Amino acid sequence: MPKSRQPTAHQTAGSGPQLSYSEGGRSGTIRYTSSETSFDIWYEFAMPPALVIIGIPESRYWEAQTKISLAQRKDTLQFIADQVIKDKLTGDGYAQFDEQFITICTGKKPATVYD
């Protein structure tokens, strides 16, 4: 992702979860770490207006792969998307979610895009 080629860690205020990034060319890994769990998800660069596509565990595999309850999936994915936008974009950005991917796009969120 833009901004850095070295592994980096970013943390929200307080002792909340952290994301760290391992970057290698057109793809890499995002590590989510909290006091309860840690897991890796992959990403790769995309075609505009998308910047990056992040692969996420499907609902049926979520708890086994992340050790986070299914009830917390939406909030966890929103945190990841918001933090990637904050850490890696220099301007506006928004996220689109589906069962297997988070797509991070540059610019303002169009009125026709649904979460």
Where are these regions (language model features)?
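Short, surface-exposed linear segments at secondary-structure transitions and domain or protein termini
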Residues: 47-57
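Amphipathic, interaction-prone secondary-structure segments
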Residues: 10-48
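Short, basic/low-complexity N-terminal boundary segments at the transition from targeting/disordered tails
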Residues: 1-18, 77, 108-109
